[in-house]
Design a protein with these regions (language model features):
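N-terminal active-site segment of His-dependent metallophosphoesterases
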Residues: 1-52, 59-67, 135
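Active-site neighborhood of phospho(di)ester-bond hydrolases with catalytic His/Asp-centered motifs
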Residues: 5-7, 27-32, 51-56, 81-86, ...
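Short coil/turn segments at beta-strand junctions that form active-site/ligand-binding loops
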Residues: 1, 25, 48, 96-97, ...
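Conserved beta-sheet core of the metallophosphoesterase superfamily
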Residues: 41-45, 49-53, 96-99, 183-219
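Beta-strand-turn-beta hairpins that frame and shape the catalytic cleft
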Residues: 1-4, 88-102, 121, 125, ...
Length: 219
C-alpha cells in the first residue's frame, strides 16, 4: 500500500493547496490541518480513502470533548475516517489487510523520564496558552494534557496487544499506527535538541513499536 502523508498544514494561515500524490492508495492526515476545520472540506472528494487523526491545534479555543464530537460529525459528513482511540481495517491493492490504529496520543511529558517531568510540564505552559483549550470549564493545562495522554497510551498498548481474528472482518495482516505526537525522541527536530520543550512534541513510546509495520506521526 502506498500512503500519502499530510500533516501540520495549518491551512488557517498558510497558502497551500493539497493535491493527491500520483499512485497513492490512501491519504493520512496526521493532525494540525486547520484550526478552523473549514479546510477539511478539501478532502471530501479525494480520489483515495482519507484517514484523519486530530492534532492538538484542532482543539484550539474549544472544549476538547465537544470539539472531538464536532470533528466526528464533520468528518462523517465529508466521508473522512477520523480515528481517535479507534482502529480501521482496509484491504490493500495486494490483498493484505491493513489495520490502522489512530490516536492523537497527547504528550505525557515523560520523554526524558519521570525525574525531568516537572521541567517538561513547566515548559509546556507556553504551548497550553497558545492552544487555549478547555475541558469541563477548566483550562486544559499540562496536568490535564498528561491525564489524557496516559489514557491514550493505555488504549494504544492494549490495542497493539490484540491478535487478528481469523476468518472475520476483524482480521488483519499488518498494523500501521497513526499519532499526531511523535512516538520517540528520534522523531524530534534535531534543531531543538534535548530541551524540556521537546517533551511537548514527542513521547517515549519506543516500547510499543515491536510488531508495528509503520508508525506515522505529525508535528
Amino acid at each position: 500500500m502506498r500512503i500519502q502523508l499530510l500533516s501540520d498544514l495549518h491551512l488557517e494561515t498558510e497558502d497551500y493547496t493539497p493535491r493527491a500524490a500520483p499512485g497513492a492508495d490512501l491519504l493520512v492526515l496526521a493532525g494540525d490541518i486547520d484550526t478552523t476545520w473549514s479546510s477539511l472540506s478539501l478532502f471530501a472528494n479525494w480520489p483515495t480513502p482519507v484517514v484523519f487523526v486530530p492534532g492538538n491545534h484542532e482543539f484550539d479555543g474549544r472544549d476538547v470533548d465537544e470539539a472531538l464530537a464536532g470533528l466526528r460529525d464533520q468528518c462523517r459528513h465529508l466521508g473522512i475516517h477520523l480515528l481517535e482511540k479507534e482502529t480501521w481495517i482496509t484491504t490493500a491493492p495486494d490483498g493484505r489487510r491493513i489495520r490502522f490504529v489512530g490516536t492523537t496520543r497527547w504528550c505525557d511529558f515523560d520523554l526524558f523520564g519521570s525525574e525531568q517531568r516537572p521541567r517538561s510540564m513547566r515548559a509546556a505552559n507556553y504551548f497550553v496558552k497558545v492552544m487555549r483549550a478547555m475541558r469541563n470549564g477548566q483550562i486544559f493545562d499540562p496536568d490535564a494534557v498528561r491525564a489524557e495522554a496516559l489514557v491514550c497510551k493505555d488504549w494504544l498498548r492494549e490495542t497493539l496487544r490484540q491478535t487478528p481474528q481469523t476468518d472475520s472482518d476483524a482480521n488483519w495482516d499488518t498494523t500501521v499506527v497513526i499519532t499526531h505526537y511523535g512516538p520517540s525522541l528520534r522523531s524530534a527536530d534535531p534543531r531543538y535538541g534535548k530541551q524540556p520543550g521537546t517533551a511537548s512534541f514527542c513521547n517515549a513510546d519506543d516500547d510499543l513499536m515491536p510488531g508495528v509495520a509503520c508508525w506515522i506521526h505529525g508535528h
